[in-house]
């Protein structure tokens, strides 16, 4: 049973998926830090010049006693767009590499005259 689990766990697809999940989680933290520390302050500075003292991170309104935090939503959308763009570039690079490999793969040579004659004989014998 352990041997079967070991074979399953160390197959390429499962191991690749595990590595992808771990790297994705780490990348998500990097994007969150980038948005929190760099992008949102820049957007806040630009909007504060236009709207006077605006901090997007604290944008919210309340319905009754429930706060609706629009700033958090905007921050999350920006994070999503960054991750989606990076993944788009990654997939685009992989696809272009695959296309190059497909083009570089040599086509099978046409069958020789002998093979064509043998096929004709085979086909005529099958009739």
Swiss-Prot record:
This is Large-conductance mechanosensitive channel. Homopentamer. Channel that opens in response to stretch forces in the membrane lipid bilayer. May participate in the regulation of osmotic pressure changes within the cell. It holds the Pfam family MscL. One of its GO terms (molecular function) is mechanosensitive monoatomic ion channel activity. InterPro entries: Mechanosensitive_channel_CS, MS_channel, MSC/AndL, MscL_channel. It is found in: Cell membrane. It is a multi-pass membrane protein.
